[in-house]
């Protein structure tokens, strides 16, 4: 038998041929991925143009922050979607706290583009999946427990909001969209702490949203709610009106018997 020697370049040719076949097959079977990348690049470019025109004055040309506004590097798309999507940004004027404004100054497409640009600066919280922002399939009992432990101290036990220090306040959560509640938890706007997935899981956040929607849909069986502000407002009401009424009655009875 005669031994056949392989050409030294045979292995290299086989590897090159294999790469060509695999690369060609991938390009044929995954055209949508390439299209998605192109759209994403266009979205980032559009977002940068919007950012430079509307945000760079306060946040810097590269989002690095200035004396007039904080850095946006690492805040993620969720922060932009929350702040701009609720009308808190652009800031209407100098104030202690940004308040939601209506109407919103940008379209959903423009907000998505700006969010994509800010997300490209550095990793940060992404816009949440819709399956965790509707409250559907959430555990209402668990949501109520999580809310009382983590949120009620500022937002009140009924989500009616409350006063904070230095002129700030915790806004009411009544009628707030589930996505806004979720994004606030993962971005921590203003004085609010951040509740990432290690603190409260996505399922837990969805349960909180379910609890908020359930309490808001409950029918009031009667009585004065006093703004649902809890024992402080109730105590003030008793002291001012209740005690005042008692003093008035005492004075009236004293004059009558005199």
Region roles according to the model:
Residues 1-8:
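Cytosolic-side transmembrane helix boundary signature
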Residues 8-31, 103-129, 196-257:
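C-terminal capping alpha-helices of c-type cytochrome domains
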Residues 30-43:
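Ser/Thr/Pro/Gly-rich low-complexity linker/stalk segments immediately outside membranes or between
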Residues 73-122, 164-220:
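Extracytoplasmic electron-transfer domains, predominantly the class I c-type cytochrome c fold
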Residues 98-99, 155, 254:
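Generic secondary-structure boundary signal with a strong preference for alpha-helix termini
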């Amino acid at each position: 038998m005669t031994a056949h020697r392989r050409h030294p370049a045979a292995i290299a040719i086989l590897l090159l041929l294999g790469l060509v076949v695999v690369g060609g097959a991938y390009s044929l079977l995954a055209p949508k991925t390439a299209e998605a990348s192109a759209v994403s690049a266009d979205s980032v470019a559009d977002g940068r143009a919007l950012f430079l025109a509307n945000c760079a004055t306060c946040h810097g040309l590269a989002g690095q922050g200035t004396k007039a506004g904080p850095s946006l590097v690492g805040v993620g798309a969720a922060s932009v979607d929350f702040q701009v999507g609720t009308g808190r940004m652009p800031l209407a004027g100098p104030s202690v706290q940004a308040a939601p404004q209506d109407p919103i100054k940008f379209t959903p497409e423009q907000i998505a583009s700006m969010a994509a640009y800010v997300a490209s600066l550095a990793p940060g919280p992404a816009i949440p999946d819709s399956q965790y922002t509707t409250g559907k399939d959430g555990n209402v009992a668990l949501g109520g427990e999580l809310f009382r432990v983590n949120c009620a101290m500022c937002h009140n036990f009924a989500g009616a909001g409350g006063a904070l220090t230095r002129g700030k306040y915790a806004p009411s959560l009544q009628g707030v969209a589930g996505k806004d509640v979720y994004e606030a938890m993962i971005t921590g706007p203003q004085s609010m702490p951040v509740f990432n997935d290690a603190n409260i899981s996505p399922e837990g956040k969805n349960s909180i949203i379910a609890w908020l929607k359930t309490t808001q849909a409950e029918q009031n069986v009667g009585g004065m709610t006093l703004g649902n502000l809890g024992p402080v407002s109730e105590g003030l009401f008793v002291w001012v009106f209740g005690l005042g009424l008692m003093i008035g009655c005492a004075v009236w009875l004293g004059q009558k018997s005199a």
